[in-house]
Structure formats: C-alpha cells, structure tokens
Amino acid sequence: MRKVNTNRLSEETHTSPQGRFACSEKAVSEELGRQPASTDLLELHPFDVAIVRVPPDKRNWPYHSHSAQWEFYHVISGAGKVRDEEGLTAIEAGDAFIFEPGKAHQIINDGTEQLVLYLVADNPLGGSTYYPDSQKWAVRSPERRIIRSDPLDYFDGEE
C-alpha cells in the first residue's frame, strides 16, 4: 500500500502572466507514485487525484474542454461558480459535479474565501484540450504544445 497525508503535501501554484487565472494544486496521485509523462499504464495510474485551491476573484484555468478526459469535482470548502456550455452554476461545499469529454468548463471563485476542491480525472493517453474563447488547442507529444490552425481538408498535402 502507498500512503500520503495530504495535509503535508506541498502545493504547486499556477498563475497567468496578468493574474486573471490562478490556482494551487496538491498532486496527490503523483505523491503516490503516478508518473504523468509515462505511457506505461501501471506508472500512469487509471486516474489522477488532486486537491485544487482557487483564490478569491480568480479562475482556475481558461475555459476549456478535453477530447477524451473525464473530470469529477467535489467542493471541500468555499463557494463559487462553474462556467459550462449551459452558463454559470453556483457551487458550494458538499457539491459534486462531473464533466465528460468534449464539455467545456471553468471554475470561478467569485467569493471572498479560498475555493477548495477534490479533482479526479482519468487522464487518458492521447487526449488534447480545446480552448473555445481563444480557439486554440493544447496537445501532448509528449510535451505540451499550444497550437492554432485554420481548418484543412483531410487530404491537404497528402497527394
């Protein structure tokens, strides 16, 4: 058995250059041995668990959808909103919600306290992320690359 105490885990903080987006994560699965860059399913683990903290007046990440990844959230403390294709939905401690692949989403802390959530994702191999507001993609091969492209015919450049 592998065991960690999440109260003792360090946090990795992510902040955008102008500060609109910010969150901190405790990478629980990685502390339990998950190797996110591996293609070995035993090293990758079947799911990824993190404790995410979003400061007041911040969004966790730009509005995005995953091509193949499921994400489950459970609000531990605080309150805020979730932006998805249906609009804005209020969330508070005790709420749980899930996003299936292809469904754009974003966590917004419009409150005055930290918004803390459990995040469980299945992190499948070969997934990509689409950002509808900026019309760009993030792909991994194996490092993450951000791209934007005009639509092309499937056979463009092939014949």
What kind of feature is each model-predicted range?
Residues 1-46, 133-159:
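A short, N-terminal "cap"/entry segment at the start of jelly-roll beta-barrel domains
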Residues 30-37, 50-66, 101:
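Conserved short histidine dyad/triad with adjacent acidic residue
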Residues 46-47, 51-55, 65-83, 121-124:
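Short, conserved beta-strand element in jelly-roll/cupin
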Residues 61, 87-89, 129:
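Short beta-strand segments
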Residues 81, 101-127:
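Ligand-binding loop in jelly-roll beta-barrel domains
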Residues 86-102:
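Short acidic-glycine-tyrosine-enriched beta hairpin
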